A protein has these predicted regions:
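Extended mixed-charge, aromatic/glycine-enriched low-complexity segments
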Residues: 1-189
Length: 189
Protein backbone atom coordinates (compact mmCIF):
# COMPACT_ATOMS: atom_id res chain seq x y z
CA UNK A 1 0.00 0.00 0.00
CA UNK A 2 1.77 3.17 -1.12
CA UNK A 3 0.49 6.54 -0.04
CA UNK A 4 1.30 9.88 -1.68
CA UNK A 5 3.62 12.12 0.27
CA UNK A 6 5.94 15.04 -0.43
CA UNK A 7 8.96 12.90 -1.11
CA UNK A 8 10.24 14.80 -4.12
CA UNK A 9 11.85 17.64 -2.14
CA UNK A 10 13.53 15.40 0.40
CA UNK A 11 14.68 12.88 -2.20
CA UNK A 12 16.04 15.65 -4.43
CA UNK A 13 17.86 17.30 -1.51
CA UNK A 14 19.27 13.94 -0.40
CA UNK A 15 20.44 13.17 -3.93
CA UNK A 16 22.06 16.62 -4.03
CA UNK A 17 23.88 15.75 -0.80
CA UNK A 18 25.42 12.69 -2.45
CA UNK A 19 26.27 14.75 -5.53
CA UNK A 20 28.02 17.33 -3.33
CA UNK A 21 30.14 14.60 -1.73
CA UNK A 22 31.08 13.25 -5.17
CA UNK A 23 32.15 16.75 -6.26
CA UNK A 24 34.32 17.05 -3.15
CA UNK A 25 35.92 13.68 -4.03
CA UNK A 26 36.65 14.97 -7.55
CA UNK A 27 38.27 18.07 -6.09
CA UNK A 28 40.41 15.98 -3.74
CA UNK A 29 41.48 13.79 -6.66
CA UNK A 30 42.61 16.87 -8.61
CA UNK A 31 44.69 17.86 -5.57
CA UNK A 32 46.47 14.52 -5.42
CA UNK A 33 44.25 12.09 -3.55
CA UNK A 34 44.85 8.54 -4.75
CA UNK A 35 42.75 7.64 -7.76
CA UNK A 36 41.89 4.19 -6.35
CA UNK A 37 40.71 5.72 -3.06
CA UNK A 38 38.55 8.26 -4.91
CA UNK A 39 36.95 5.56 -7.06
CA UNK A 40 36.35 3.30 -4.06
CA UNK A 41 34.82 6.09 -1.96
CA UNK A 42 32.70 7.24 -4.91
CA UNK A 43 31.40 3.70 -5.33
CA UNK A 44 30.62 3.45 -1.60
CA UNK A 45 28.69 6.73 -1.83
CA UNK A 46 26.69 5.43 -4.79
CA UNK A 47 25.92 2.17 -2.95
CA UNK A 48 24.79 4.13 0.11
CA UNK A 49 22.50 6.26 -2.05
CA UNK A 50 21.04 3.11 -3.62
CA UNK A 51 20.51 1.65 -0.14
CA UNK A 52 18.49 4.69 0.91
CA UNK A 53 16.48 4.62 -2.31
CA UNK A 54 15.64 0.93 -2.13
CA UNK A 55 16.33 -1.13 0.99
CA UNK A 56 16.32 1.27 3.94
CA UNK A 57 12.54 1.63 3.97
CA UNK A 58 12.14 -2.15 4.25
CA UNK A 59 14.50 -2.18 7.23
CA UNK A 60 12.17 0.28 9.01
CA UNK A 61 9.07 -1.92 8.78
CA UNK A 62 9.68 -3.84 12.01
CA UNK A 63 7.79 -2.43 14.96
CA UNK A 64 10.47 -3.38 17.48
CA UNK A 65 13.75 -3.25 15.57
CA UNK A 66 16.87 -3.82 17.66
CA UNK A 67 18.72 -1.34 15.42
CA UNK A 68 18.43 2.29 16.55
CA UNK A 69 18.58 3.52 12.93
CA UNK A 70 15.56 1.36 12.00
CA UNK A 71 13.39 1.47 15.12
CA UNK A 72 10.57 3.89 14.35
CA UNK A 73 9.75 4.46 18.02
CA UNK A 74 13.34 5.24 19.00
CA UNK A 75 14.44 7.13 15.88
CA UNK A 76 11.36 9.37 15.86
CA UNK A 77 11.61 10.25 19.56
CA UNK A 78 13.15 13.59 20.48
CA UNK A 79 15.94 13.00 23.00
CA UNK A 80 15.75 16.64 24.13
CA UNK A 81 12.00 16.91 24.76
CA UNK A 82 10.14 14.45 26.99
CA UNK A 83 6.83 15.48 25.42
CA UNK A 84 8.03 13.95 22.16
CA UNK A 85 9.59 10.76 23.50
CA UNK A 86 8.38 7.23 23.61
CA UNK A 87 10.34 4.58 25.45
CA UNK A 88 11.07 1.33 23.62
CA UNK A 89 10.46 -1.97 25.36
CA UNK A 90 13.65 -3.39 23.83
CA UNK A 91 17.33 -2.46 23.56
CA UNK A 92 19.11 -1.26 20.44
CA UNK A 93 22.29 -3.33 20.39
CA UNK A 94 22.26 -4.24 16.71
CA UNK A 95 23.99 -2.04 14.13
CA UNK A 96 22.95 -2.08 10.50
CA UNK A 97 25.94 -2.70 8.27
CA UNK A 98 24.55 -0.49 5.49
CA UNK A 99 23.71 2.41 7.84
CA UNK A 100 27.18 2.18 9.38
CA UNK A 101 28.78 2.16 5.92
CA UNK A 102 26.89 5.36 5.08
CA UNK A 103 28.04 7.10 8.27
CA UNK A 104 31.62 5.88 7.82
CA UNK A 105 32.02 6.99 4.21
CA UNK A 106 30.71 10.48 5.00
CA UNK A 107 33.12 10.79 7.94
CA UNK A 108 35.97 9.46 5.80
CA UNK A 109 35.44 12.19 3.21
CA UNK A 110 35.33 14.85 5.93
CA UNK A 111 38.61 13.47 7.28
CA UNK A 112 40.17 13.57 3.82
CA UNK A 113 39.25 17.24 3.48
CA UNK A 114 41.13 17.92 6.70
CA UNK A 115 44.14 15.97 5.40
CA UNK A 116 44.28 18.13 2.26
CA UNK A 117 43.97 21.48 4.05
CA UNK A 118 47.44 22.55 2.87
CA UNK A 119 46.69 21.81 -0.79
CA UNK A 120 43.19 23.27 -0.60
CA UNK A 121 44.14 26.32 1.37
CA UNK A 122 42.56 27.15 4.71
CA UNK A 123 39.53 28.99 3.28
CA UNK A 124 38.75 26.35 0.64
CA UNK A 125 39.12 23.56 3.22
CA UNK A 126 36.69 25.37 5.53
CA UNK A 127 34.26 25.82 2.62
CA UNK A 128 34.53 22.14 1.68
CA UNK A 129 34.00 21.02 5.28
CA UNK A 130 30.97 23.30 5.47
CA UNK A 131 29.65 21.81 2.20
CA UNK A 132 30.29 18.28 3.48
CA UNK A 133 28.42 18.96 6.73
CA UNK A 134 25.48 20.45 4.83
CA UNK A 135 25.49 17.56 2.35
CA UNK A 136 25.51 15.04 5.22
CA UNK A 137 22.60 16.90 6.85
CA UNK A 138 20.63 16.67 3.57
CA UNK A 139 21.32 12.94 3.35
CA UNK A 140 20.26 12.28 6.94
CA UNK A 141 17.17 14.46 6.51
CA UNK A 142 16.22 12.31 3.51
CA UNK A 143 16.80 9.19 5.58
CA UNK A 144 14.62 10.65 8.35
CA UNK A 145 11.89 11.44 5.85
CA UNK A 146 11.91 7.85 4.62
CA UNK A 147 11.55 6.65 8.22
CA UNK A 148 8.71 9.10 8.94
CA UNK A 149 6.94 8.07 5.72
CA UNK A 150 7.18 4.39 6.68
CA UNK A 151 5.86 5.20 10.15
CA UNK A 152 2.94 7.12 8.62
CA UNK A 153 2.18 4.24 6.25
CA UNK A 154 2.33 1.74 9.12
CA UNK A 155 -0.28 3.68 11.10
CA UNK A 156 -2.49 4.07 8.03
CA UNK A 157 -2.32 0.31 7.47
CA UNK A 158 -3.31 -0.26 11.11
CA UNK A 159 -6.35 1.98 10.67
CA UNK A 160 -7.38 0.37 7.38
CA UNK A 161 -6.92 -3.12 8.82
CA UNK A 162 -9.25 -2.34 11.74
CA UNK A 163 -12.01 -0.66 9.72
CA UNK A 164 -15.42 -2.22 10.08
CA UNK A 165 -17.62 -2.92 7.10
CA UNK A 166 -19.63 0.30 7.56
CA UNK A 167 -16.64 2.61 8.23
CA UNK A 168 -14.58 4.76 5.88
CA UNK A 169 -11.08 6.15 6.17
CA UNK A 170 -10.55 9.45 4.36
CA UNK A 171 -7.23 11.21 3.89
CA UNK A 172 -7.44 14.93 3.25
CA UNK A 173 -4.19 16.32 1.97
CA UNK A 174 -4.34 19.67 0.22
CA UNK A 175 -0.83 19.31 -1.16
CA UNK A 176 -1.41 16.12 -3.14
CA UNK A 177 -0.63 16.31 -6.82
CA UNK A 178 0.54 14.07 -9.60
CA UNK A 179 4.31 13.81 -9.80
CA UNK A 180 5.97 11.87 -12.56
CA UNK A 181 8.48 9.55 -10.84
CA UNK A 182 11.01 10.17 -13.60
CA UNK A 183 11.13 13.90 -12.94
CA UNK A 184 11.38 14.25 -9.16
CA UNK A 185 12.73 17.71 -8.58
CA UNK A 186 12.80 20.24 -5.82
CA UNK A 187 9.75 22.49 -5.55
CA UNK A 188 11.79 25.41 -4.22
CA UNK A 189 14.69 27.13 -5.92
Amino acid sequence: MGFCRGLENNAAEGADGFKDFLQIIDELERLGAENDWCKEVGERLRKSKLYLKTTYRNHCKEDDSKCADHCRVFALSDAGDTDFQKICSHSHKVKCEDCEKLKNVLEEVKGAISEYTMQLGMFQAEDDLYEAKNAAAKIFEWRGHILRAENQDWYKRQIVDTLKRDETFIIVDWTMKFIAMKFWEKQVE
